[in-house]
């Protein structure tokens, strides 16, 4: 069976590296994936789980708002809490491409004469 998905979105929060009791590093993040249908925007919030080196790089190089492309597989878990049933879908990342950084509100001073610097 084939279980493959590719998701593009922005990180909802800054990734936080965690370690399992067995010593394996992981990061659990959510990405915001925007869709447009009939001129209406809708945002899906997709949970992503990354392990080991992939998790370490994600936490090291990415911040909230960073656009990433996640290539992985879907993991579906069904849970019951009280009398309600829940289905949780998570993308288990196999590869993550770090794309454009978050939109910055920083402004930079314009240098009119570069010779003044040297």
Residue ranges and their predicted role:
Residues 18-33, 87:
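Short aromatic-glycine-enriched beta-strand elements
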Residues 6, 12, 26, 43-45:
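Short coil/loop residues immediately preceding or within conserved phosphate-binding loops
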Residues 5-13, 31, 64-75, 93-96:
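OB-fold and OB-like beta-barrel modules that bind single-stranded nucleic acids
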Residues 1-3, 17-22, 39-41, 84, ...:
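Acidic, gly/ser/pro-rich intrinsically disordered tails
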Residues 51-86, 102:
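Beta-rich strand-turn-strand
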Residues 25, 42-44, 85-89:
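Residues on conserved beta-strands of the protein kinase catalytic domain
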Residues 14-16, 34-38, 53, 77-79, ...:
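Short coil/turn motifs at secondary-structure junctions
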């Amino acid at each position: 069976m084939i279980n493959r998905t590719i998701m593009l979105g922005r990180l909802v929060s800054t990734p936080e590296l965690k370690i399992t009791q067995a010593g394996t590093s992981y990061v659990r993040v959510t990405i915001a994936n925007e869709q447009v249908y009939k001129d209406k925007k809708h945002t899906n919030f997709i949970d992503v789980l990354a392990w080991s080196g992939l998790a370490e790089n994600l936490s090291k190089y990415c911040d909230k708002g960073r656009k990433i492309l996640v290539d992985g597989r879907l993991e579906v878990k069904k849970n019951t809490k009280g009398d309600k049933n829940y289905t949780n879908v998570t993308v288990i990342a196999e590869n993550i491409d770090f794309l454009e950084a978050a939109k910055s509100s920083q402004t930079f001073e314009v240098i009119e004469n570069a010779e003044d610097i040297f």
